[in-house]
Design a protein with these regions (language model features):
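Generic cytosolic/nucleocytoplasmic N-terminal low-complexity/intrinsically disordered segments
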Residues: 1-3, 48, 53
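Short, charge-rich amphipathic alpha-helices with coiled-coil/heptad character
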Residues: 2-18
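Non-transmembrane, amphipathic alpha-helical segments
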Residues: 16-19, 23, 52
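Short amphipathic alpha-helical heptad-repeat segments
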Residues: 23-36, 56-57
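Charged, low-complexity interaction regions
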Residues: 39-51, 69-70
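Short, charge-rich amphipathic interface segments used for partner binding and complex assembly
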Residues: 51-82
């Protein structure tokens, strides 16, 4: 994202750096690619909806989906909920 990084993005990057340092670059790239795809899919949303999508909803989805590459679904969900 070109805008200021969200707390979800920041916390995701911190999680992968601490828990999966050998795969951090790969996971950060996957997160960025998924987030950009989600943003593109929702480009037609109203400005009000865009704000919430960009700040919370879409980064949360991208973090959850990416973390599932390295941990069980429930653990990924709990990790994102902890952000």
């Amino acid at each position: 994202m070109k805008a200021k990084e969200t707390y979800l993005s920041r916390d995701f990057r911190e999680t992968v750096a601490l828990r999966f340092p050998a795969r951090a670059k790969e996971l950060n790239t996957a997160f960025d690619m998924r987030l950009n795809a989600l943003l593109a899919e929702n480009a037609g949303a109203s400005k009000e909806k865009q704000y919430h999508l960009k700040r919370q909803i879409l980064p949360g989805i991208a973090a959850y989906e990416t973390l599932q590459r390295v941990m069980p679904k429930e653990e990924a969900l709990q990790t994102v909920h902890g952000y």
